[in-house]
Amino acid sequence: MPELRYCHGPYRGKECPVCGKPGKIMMNEAEINEVSRTLAAVLRHDPGRYGIRLDSHGYARISSLVSMFRKRKGMRWMTDDHLVYLAETDPRKRYQISGVLIRAVYGHTIDVDLTDLPTDGIPDTLYYQSSTAEAPLVKEAGIYPSDKSWIHLSGTYRKSFVSGLYHIDDPLVLAVNARSMIENGIDIFRSNDDIYLTKQVPPEYITIAEKEEVVLTDEEKDDIKRVREKNSGRD
């Protein structure tokens, strides 16, 4: 994972994308991992465990989060800027900054009202990761939230397929007729350009997607391997 640096703005990597200079190191790889893991846990899953209060839309005060981190050994250096820069450069686009507040925009297992997310720019077709065994049931009963509080749909076949590889060897990708859903009054919200949220996908909007060739990057291969090894250790 690249370092978090600052020059003409925050960025991940060795060189400023504007001038090519190395810039100032804000957080190293270990610090990014620790802060990112904890931030996701607080904003998505269990804020009370960390003594953080979220509002109904999932926002927490940045200053409260920074105070929490600064109580940890070796983290007195943490400032509001560190947290903001981390969120702004997050490669998974998990966070939204609104003034002095921050929230996660997807991945919640707690009940959070995300209906203030944008509803424009929704692709006509969205995608959902499934499996050969699960697909017949999904096509018959539809899609409903399971381990998360919202259904997560992908903007591309590739994104959905790669997401599925974190769980199984050969995902089956389903196509969702998002345009028809919206026309019939079912809300879909845009978390970012890759992830879209809804509360239900009735079966009549679901088909098996036409298969596309997907070539993984080395980074994706390494990340999938890391996550699956971690998950297998929990079994």
Curated annotation (Swiss-Prot):
SUPFAM superfamilies assigned to the protein according to its UniProt record, in alphabetical order: ADP-ribosylation
Short name of one Pfam family: PTS_2-RNA
GO biological process: tRNA splicing, via endonucleolytic cleavage and ligation
Entry superkingdom: Archaea
GO MF term set: NAD+ poly-ADP-ribosyltransferase activity; tRNA 2'-phosphotransferase activity
Keywords associated with the record: NAD, Transferase
Known EC number: 2.7.1.-
Keyword Nucleotidyltransferase: no
Family affiliation: Belongs to the KptA/TPT1 family.
Annotated function: Removes the 2'-phosphate from RNA via an intermediate in which the phosphate is ADP-ribosylated by NAD followed by a presumed transesterification to release the RNA and generate ADP-ribose 1''-2''-cyclic phosphate (APPR>P). May function as an ADP-ribosylase.
Protein name: Probable RNA 2'-phosphotransferase
